[in-house]
UniProtKB/Swiss-Prot annotation:
Lineage: Bacteria, Pseudomonadati, Pseudomonadota, Alphaproteobacteria, Hyphomicrobiales
Any one GO molecular-function label of the UniProt entry: polyprenyldihydroxybenzoate methyltransferase activity
Name this polypeptide is given: Ubiquinone biosynthesis O-methyltransferase
UniProt keyword annotation of Methyltransferase present: yes
Protein purpose: O-methyltransferase that catalyzes the 2 O-methylation steps in the ubiquinone biosynthetic pathway.
Superkingdom as given in the UniProt entry: Bacteria
UniProt entry keywords in alphabetical sequence: Methyltransferase, S-adenosyl-L-methionine, Transferase, Ubiquinone biosynthesis
Amino acid sequence: MSETARTTIDQSEVDRFSAMAAEWWDPTGKFRPLHKFNPVRLAYIRDRVAEHFGRDPKSRQPLEGLRLLDIGCGGGLLCEPMARMGADVLGADASEKNIGIARTHAAGSGVRVDYRAVTAEALAEAGESFDVVLNMEVVEHVADVDFFMTTCAHMVRPGGMMFVATINRTLKAAALAIFAAENVLRWLPRGTHQYEKLVRPEEIENPLVASGLEIADRTGVFFNPLSNQWNLSKDMDVNYMIVAKRPI
């Protein structure tokens, strides 16, 4: 198959999330787990970006002047806080409905975000480039992981960085992130995740390294039911995040 014919889009996944688009900003709705997850991933992104670019993470706008892409942005749960931290944000999603919800919410919140209903490959073909690329809870929903990671890596500027967050393909993840989360606790609608589409860390890292990026950090993330919060962890068996950087 030629590169131009390849696609990262799994239309069934786009349709699934489009059907839930109206609930993106409801903290008690179908995206409640992402609302719970947001504080730990926001802090992780802010701190790693500030460290890399020599910024003060406690300043009001530590991302000022940086161009940031949130690919698969959904309703904008990450885009808006990134914009508030000073970044020039492009939020991209294959779902027109998601983008519509994101635009409406940003307008009501007074936050400036450039939202586009566009694919990663279309952005890359247009020559777009960014200081920071976010792939957060997206890769397990795409059609071609290797092509997706390679495509996104090409949009990382020299000296820039990429964040990836996803779910590991392990029996532990199948038990906790799929069976328990979707069937027992009902945190997510059934069918949100499929075991065969979960992604192991090396399946993220290999195409990034092949595209000239260097792996800079890895961390697991776990949910503590006692504190009702997500925390960073050394255990990457279920949820995890990876940071990669492109040398100058």
